[in-house]
Amino acid sequence: MQLLLNPLVGAISAGCTALLKPSPYTPHVAKTIEGLISEIFDEQYVAVVQGDREVNTLLFGMRWDAIFFTGSPALGRIVMAAAAKNLTPVVLELGGKSPCIVDRGANIEVAARRIAWGKTLNAGQTCIAPDYLLIHRSLQDRFTEAFARALHRLHGDDAQQSPHYVRLVNDRAFAVSYTHLRAHETTLHLV
């Protein structure tokens, strides 16, 4: 939701109109946002359109003053190519790598809490979610214990029952995560 609404704040602040196109992978969130936007704004200023590839194709064929896109690099290339036809300025939020570094001077409990929160927020499906941890070998065991405590505080004894523990958005996201885990299972230290 934040990836859709944060750019809207900038557009409104600049006096621009906006058309929001939420992800089809989160239909309940999209419907909620559409309802809120329609209650708050006249649709000539801010509107929401929903759909999948067909809607994207229609939108890509239109002339825009600017495009702010959040999503995959593959779709980002399509957005950029479509925008180039009209020399439309584009901001692409395509994610990246977000390492965490824990050195010997770090407060282990604080680091573990923050990393656990950042990685489990939205099932780690944000572009700023921690991807990997670089930690001094002497801190590995202390950190692992602190991280386990932090996860327990966030999600309780059974994460599956926690109202704060979210799930991966679809089977494809699960398959990608599973593939990464399997590829690195000999070097992973699982909590």
Predicted regions and their residues:
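Single conserved hydrophobic/aromatic residue that forms the stacking wall/gate
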Residues: H180-A183, T187-V191
